[in-house]
Amino acid sequence: MPMGINAARKMEDDWKKLRWSDPHYCRRALGLKVKADPLGGAPRARGIVLEKVGVEAKQPNSAIRKCVRIQLIKNGRQVTAFCPGDGAIGFIDEHDEVVVERIGGRMGRSMGDIPGVRFKVVAVNNVSLEEMVSGRKEKPVR
C-alpha cells in the first residue's frame, strides 16, 4: 500500500474495495435486510388470517403458545404471529384482517421461548387486541 504524500486517492480506492469483504457493509450497501424482511422495512403490516396454530415453547418451559398464520396483503408472504394476552386467540378468527408488528427479540429475531415467531398481532379488524383482551372494546362484526 502506498504511503507517500500523494497517496490519498490510492489508499481511499483500496479501502473502498476492501470494504466489500466486511459482511456488515455488504448487507447494508446492498439493502439485504429490507429485501429479506417480510414487512419490507415498514414498522407494521396488514394481513389476512389463514389459520390458528399452536407453537410449543422451548425447553425448559412447557406450553403451547397461541399464534396465527398470516398472509400479508402487501406482498403475499406468509408469516407466523404471536397473539399476546390471556384469551387473545378467541378474538381472532380465520379470514380476519390483522395488523402485525415485530415482536422485539434481539437482532430482529424471535423472542423468549417462542421459536421461529418474529411478529405479534396488534389489532384485529382495526381494533386494538389489547383493548379487546382487557374488555374495554368489542370486536366489530364484519
Curated annotation (Swiss-Prot):
Q: Which PROSITE patterns match?
A: RIBOSOMAL_S12
List the molecular function annotations (GO) for this entry.
rRNA binding; structural constituent of ribosome
Provide the Gene Ontology terms for cellular component. small ribosomal subunit
Entries under Pfam families matching the protein: Ribosom_S12_S23
What GO biological process terms are annotated to this protein in UniProt? translation
Sequence similarity: Belongs to the universal ribosomal protein uS12 family.
Q: What is the official name of this protein in its record?
A: Small ribosomal subunit protein uS12
Query: What organism is listed for this UniProt entry?
Result: Methanothrix thermoacetophila (strain DSM 6194 / JCM 14653 / NBRC 101360 / PT)
Gene encoding this chain? rps12
